[in-house]
């Protein structure tokens, strides 16, 4: 029963994040990255705050430092991902974003002295993932997109791993899933605010674009709740493996709605990255 609930949560998580990525992809040509991030995160924080009496989570936290650190790392990761969504095929950007499990073992090793050192299998998976990145870059010919954007996407995955690391720590500290969603959205919105059109006073995007990004923020809140629920539960293997279905969903959605065709070589690189990440999650869960 518990595993079925995890599967259901993971399905909601990947559907929400896929639709959110699609909306951001469409609006990235109309709005600057900082504006998208602020509207998305502020909308998420305000809606969760408005529903606080119903959701029943505490507005005071005993781990505010962890929330701030997770929010800052997540903001950088989201900024990079939003940028890559605008310049890369949607499925390629989503795949690069899901490299974060490959970095998680290295992040834990660098930040937690008690963490178990990555084994040979985990290091081999990391190497396999980078082989997939090289295939995407295609140094001898035309790659799957601008090489700088692909390299930046890898950096974004590393930053996302830093944010994911704090989910378990927050869960251990007794923080609820909706507390994590609220504080993550709040910190990210405040971090993006100084770079937005509200400060520059040069807003050019229309009301419709902002409304779409608000919807993306609500979908992001649902997705973040799924992340907090699945990755904080102690049994993240099923959820983390299932989230890679969103790569397939992104491929289909971007092809049908945007006409984005991905080459056979790019598909091969994406397959290597996904296989490496799934193997990493499976190995860690044994």
Language model regions located:
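Structural signature of hydrophobic alpha-helical transmembrane segments
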Residues: 29-46, 82-103, 146-159, 205-220, ...
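C-terminal transmembrane-helix exit sites in multi-pass transporters
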Residues: 83, 100-124, 248-267
């Amino acid at each position: 029963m518990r595993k079925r609930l995890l599967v259901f949560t993971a399905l909601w998580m990947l559907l929400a994040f896929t639709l959110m990525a699609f909306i951001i992809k469409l609006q990235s040509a109309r709005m600057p990255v900082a504006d998208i991030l602020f509207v998305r995160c502020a909308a998420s924080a305000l809606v969760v705050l408005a529903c606080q009496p119903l959701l029943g989570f505490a507005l005071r936290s005993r781990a505010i430092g962890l929330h701030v650190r997770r929010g800052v790392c997540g903001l950088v990761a989201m900024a990079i991902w939003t940028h890559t969504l605008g310049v890369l095929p949607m499925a390629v950007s989503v795949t690069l974003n899901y490299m974060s499990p490959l970095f998680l073992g290295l992040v834990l090793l660098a930040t937690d002295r008690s963490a178990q050192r990555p084994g040979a299998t985990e290091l081999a998976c990391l190497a396999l993932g980078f082989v997939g990145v090289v295939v995407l870059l295609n140094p001898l010919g035309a790659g799957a997109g601008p090489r700088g954007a692909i390299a930046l996407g890898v950096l974004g995955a590393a930053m996302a791993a830093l944010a994911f690391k704090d989910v378990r720590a927050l869960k251990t500290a007794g923080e609820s899933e909706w507390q994590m969603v609220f504080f993550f959205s709040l910190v990210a919105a405040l971090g993006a605010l100084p770079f937005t059109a509200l400060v520059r006073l040069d807003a050019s995007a229309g009301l419709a674009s902002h409304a779409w990004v608000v919807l993306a923020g609500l979908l992001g809140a649902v997705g973040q709740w799924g992340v907090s629920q699945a990755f904080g539960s102690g049994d993240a293997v099923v959820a983390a493996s299932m989230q890679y279905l969103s790569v397939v969903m992104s491929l289909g959605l971007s092809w049908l709605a945007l006409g984005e065709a991905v080459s056979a070589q790019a598909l091969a690189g994406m397959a290597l990255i996904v296989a490496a990440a799934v193997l990493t999650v499976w190995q860690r869960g044994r």
